[in-house]
């Protein structure tokens, strides 16, 4: 006889897997532009011209892709990045509202199909021999808008199945999809970047569209859809100690998890709460602080995402493929940092404190990487891993466990409809920083890469300062808890 625990375990594992793959594809389709940048404009003096070439032997830009063959190529590439990121930031605030009101399966399917289409269209510019800036900018704008369908929807779906207990660790592991997607995007782009860079976009685009079709057929939005009841929402800790759960009560899929519920997903119309308003979500304690913190944290993370391969190529003089491959170590560090941040924050019950400590440590590590990280391949590998962990750890924690915590805050009194909106507000605010970072890097880098790193260090410090009030509250909570423990021991 099959264990009664099996259905719930398998369904939860399946939801984690499919949402992991979904968002891996979203991030995979964003990454190729950072690898292809160094191919769109590079020094052509070492490239042998074709026999029938009409270019001068002194022309060092003949092999570049117009319109990125001019001296202002960094500004143009920054504009292409920003077209995506500004559209993403604007669309994210709207996406959460739609995510609360539309079936997640349809919403994600449409988003992935369109994301695959626009990612491929960027690469098709190579095969169609397109050399006008507006084409690439327009494709990036539409891609940025449709990519916003991903994050609020997958977080909301996972929140329907998992509760607060051990959420930091579970979502820290699950959130590695961001780094895995970046790594896959870099490696796939690197295969074709030196021969036919258009395929660096077309292949990830096709994979993303295929995953969208898989999502349509296999995504399970709610436990009730497979006859499982969701866990109870925000139980009283004291009551749960005095009155342990009766194993004879409730459906089998409630018994296997030690997690508390994130949301209560009743299908009965009378039990369905109304979706929370935008300003109602802003009033949830902690939403504003974490949103502004993520603005600066994501500024740093996305600057690395879009400019690290070009930085490595310029400073170390690697080829586009070598720079793209080496930059994946930053994302490997991000996987480690996300898991570590979730584990530590669960253990100490302090999300803000964990983020603040990692942000403070990231500042001197970035300074060291810029000054000593390029002195040898071994040092570069170690520094990239450390910087990736410290930069992406807080970013991962805020966009997953913190968003889910705030989206199911006790002040909502069980309203499950807040999760997607809160997630969209936090990630949308962060996406403003994601747009600013690459733009500022494009404007500052002509004055020297040192100045870019000073900008990133300043952003990290500001991100930490914005959490000071929440860190103080967590410290007070720890002191209160220690005082109670001492009182019990004395009794």
From Swiss-Prot:
Keywords for the protein's UniProt record, in alphabetical order: Antiport, Endoplasmic reticulum, Glycoprotein, Membrane, Sugar transport, Transmembrane, Transmembrane helix, Transport
The keyword ATP-binding is assigned to this record: no
Description of activity control: Inhibited by vanadate but not by chlorogenic acid.
GO CC annotations, alphabetized: endoplasmic reticulum membrane
Main subcellular localisation: endoplasmic reticulum
Record carries keyword Endoplasmic reticulum: yes
Recorded catalytic activity of this chain's protein: D-glucose 6-phosphate(in) + phosphate(out) = D-glucose 6-phosphate(out) + phosphate(in)
InterPro entries: MFS, MFS_dom, MFS_trans_sf, SLC37A1_2, Sugar_P_transporter
Spans through the membrane: 5-25, 78-98, 108-130, 132-154, 169-189, 200-220, 292-312, 328-348, 352-372, 377-397, 424-444, 452-472
Gene Ontology MF: a single term: glucose 6-phosphate:phosphate antiporter activity
Disordered: region residues: 229-257
GO biological processes: glucose-6-phosphate transport; phosphate ion transmembrane transport
Positions glycosylated per UniProt: 43, 52, 58
Function summary: Inorganic phosphate and glucose-6-phosphate antiporter. May transport cytoplasmic glucose-6-phosphate into the lumen of the endoplasmic reticulum and translocate inorganic phosphate into the opposite direction. Independent of a lumenal glucose-6-phosphatase. May not play a role in homeostatic regulation of blood glucose levels.
Family designation: Belongs to the major facilitator superfamily. Organophosphate:Pi antiporter (OPA) (TC 2.A.1.4) family.
PANTHER family tied to this protein: GLUCOSE-6-PHOSPHATE EXCHANGER SLC37A2 (PTHR43184:SF9), MAJOR FACILITATOR SUPERFAMILY TRANSPORTER 16, ISOFORM B (PTHR43184)
Name of the protein: Glucose-6-phosphate exchanger SLC37A2
Species assigned in the record: Bos taurus (Bovine)
Gene responsible for this protein: SLC37A2
């Amino acid at each position: 006889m099959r264990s009664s625990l099996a259905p719930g375990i398998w369904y939860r594992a399946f939801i984690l897997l499919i949402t992991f793959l979904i968002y891996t594809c979203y991030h995979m389709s964003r990454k190729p532009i950072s690898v292809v940048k160094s191919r769109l404009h590079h020094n052509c003096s070492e490239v042998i011209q074709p026999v029938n070439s009409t270019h001068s032997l002194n022309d060092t830009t003949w092999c570049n892709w117009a319109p990125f063959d001019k001296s202002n190529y960094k500004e143009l590439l920054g504009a292409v990045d920003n077209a995506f990121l500004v559209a993403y930031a604007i669309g994210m605030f709207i996406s959460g509202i739609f995510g609360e009101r539309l079936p997640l399966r349809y919403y994600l399917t449409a988003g992935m199909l369109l994301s695959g289409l626009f990612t491929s269209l960027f690469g098709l510019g190579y095969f169609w021999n397109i050399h006008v800036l507006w084409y690439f900018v327009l494709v990036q704008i539409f891609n940025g808008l449709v990519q916003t369908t991903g994050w609020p929807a997958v977080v909301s779906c996972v929140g329907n199945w998992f509760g607060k207990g051990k959420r930091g660790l579970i979502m820290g592991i699950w959130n590695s999809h961001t780094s895995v997607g970046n790594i896959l995007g870099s490696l796939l782009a690197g295969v074709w970047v030196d021969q036919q860079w258009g395929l660096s976009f077309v292949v990830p685009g096709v994979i993303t569209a295929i995953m969208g079709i898989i999502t349509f057929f296999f995504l399970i939005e709610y436990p009730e859809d497979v006859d499982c009841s969701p866990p109870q929402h925000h139980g009283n800790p004291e009551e749960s100690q005095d009155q342990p759960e009766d194993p004879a009560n409730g459906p089998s899929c409630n018994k296997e998890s030690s997690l508390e519920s994130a949301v209560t997903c009743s299908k009965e119309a009378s039990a369905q709460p109304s979706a929370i308003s935008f300003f109602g979500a802003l009033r949830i304690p902690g939403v504003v602080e974490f949103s502004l913190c993520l603005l600066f944290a994501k500024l740093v993370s996305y600057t690395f995402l879009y400019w690290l391969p070009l930085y490595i190529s310029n400073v170390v003089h690697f080829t586009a493929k070598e720079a793209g491959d080496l930059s994946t170590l930053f994302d490997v560090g991000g996987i480690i940092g996300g898991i570590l941040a979730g584990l530590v924050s669960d253990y100490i019950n302090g999300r803000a404190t964990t983020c603040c400590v990692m942000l403070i440590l990231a500042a001197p590590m970035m300074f060291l990487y810029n000054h000593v990280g390029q002195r040898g391949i071994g040092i570069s590998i170690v520094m990239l891993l450390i910087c990736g962990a410290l930069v992406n750890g807080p970013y991962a924690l805020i966009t997953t466990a913190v968003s889910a915590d705030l989206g199911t805050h006790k002040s909502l009194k069980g309203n499950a409809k807040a999760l997607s909106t809160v997630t969209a507000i936090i990630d949308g605010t962060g996406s403003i920083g994601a747009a600013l970072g690459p733009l500022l890097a494009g404007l500052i880098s002509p004055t020297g890469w040192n100045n870019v790193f000073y900008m990133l260090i300043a952003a990290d410090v500001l991100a930490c300062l914005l959490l000071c009030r929440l860190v103080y509250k967590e410290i007070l909570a720890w002191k209160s808890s220690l005082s109670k423990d001492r009182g019990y021991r004395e009794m």
